[in-house]
């Protein structure tokens, strides 16, 4: 799994002009699923994201997790994180998992994360528009294959 984690003041995802999910302070996750991803990757990602201390404490030090601040997550599927740009000018996405497998793992990831923090989500495979106000900015890339 490849996940772009962005600390946000607020974020929303819309489909055809209708808001599908929205959060206030928390994390926007752009979630890509690879063909070799398994339950262990989901467990690792959920544990890291829910405990990652990237929110400021009263002294301004990044010392608090999403759980500590009572924040929420907006999770958006993003197969383009597996783009291969080595050849030519058009990216290839053959490194991403097939849609049926990716959808199942994405749903499992969100369900596990939702046991720890509130989760709003986009619609898998839909053409979505994302609005956000970055906080920091703080942007972290988590790759479950690089542990």
Curated annotation (Swiss-Prot):
SUPFAM superfamilies: DTD-like
UniProt-listed Enzyme Commission number(s): 3.1.1.96
GO CC term (a single one): cytoplasm
Protein origin, superkingdom: Bacteria
CDD domains the record matches: Dtyr_deacylase
Pfam family, one: Tyr_Deacylase
Record-annotated membrane-spanning stretches: none
GO MF entries: D-tyrosyl-tRNA(Tyr) deacylase activity; Gly-tRNA(Ala) deacylase activity; Ser(Gly)-tRNA(Ala) hydrolase activity; tRNA binding
Motif Gly-cisPro motif, important for rejection of L-amino acids per record, residues: 136-137
Signal sequence bounds: none
Cellular localisation: Cytoplasm
Catalytic activity: glycyl-tRNA(Ala) + H2O = tRNA(Ala) + glycine + H(+); a D-aminoacyl-tRNA + H2O = a tRNA + a D-alpha-amino acid + H(+)
Keyword field: Cytoplasm, Hydrolase, RNA-binding, tRNA-binding
UniProt-listed GO biological process terms: D-amino acid catabolic process
Enzyme class, spelled out: hydrolase
InterPro entries reported for this sequence: Daa-tRNA_deacyls_DTD, DTD-like_sf
Primary residence: cytoplasm
Keyword Hydrolase included in the entry's annotation: yes
Positions in coiled-coil regions: none
Quaternary organization: Homodimer.
Function comment: An aminoacyl-tRNA editing enzyme that deacylates mischarged D-aminoacyl-tRNAs. Also deacylates mischarged glycyl-tRNA(Ala), protecting cells against glycine mischarging by AlaRS. Acts via tRNA-based rather than protein-based catalysis; rejects L-amino acids rather than detecting D-amino acids in the active site. By recycling D-aminoacyl-tRNA to D-amino acids and free tRNA molecules, this enzyme counteracts the toxicity associated with the formation of D-aminoacyl-tRNA entities in vivo and helps enforce protein L-homochirality.
Domain comment in the entry: A Gly-cisPro motif from one monomer fits into the active site of the other monomer to allow specific chiral rejection of L-amino acids.
Name of the protein in question: D-aminoacyl-tRNA deacylase
């Amino acid at each position: 799994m490849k996940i772009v984690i962005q600390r946000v003041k607020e974020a929303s995802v819309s489909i055809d002009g209708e808001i599908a999910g929205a959060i206030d302070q928390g994390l926007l996750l752009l979630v890509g699923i690879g063909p070799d991803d398994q339950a262990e990757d989901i467990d690792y990602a959920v544990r890291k994201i829910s405990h990652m201390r990237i929110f400021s404490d009263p002294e301004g030090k990044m010392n608090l997790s999403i759980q500590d601040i009572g924040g929420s997550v907006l999770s958006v599927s993003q197969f383009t994180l597996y783009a291969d740009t080595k050849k030519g000018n058009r990216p290839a996405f053959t490194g991403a998992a097939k849609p049926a497998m990716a959808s199942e793992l994405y749903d499992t990831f969100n369900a596990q994360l939702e046991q720890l923090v509130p989760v709003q989500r986009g619609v898998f495979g839909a053409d979505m528009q994302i609005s956000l106000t970055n906080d920091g900015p703080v942007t972290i890339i988590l790759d479950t294959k690089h542990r």
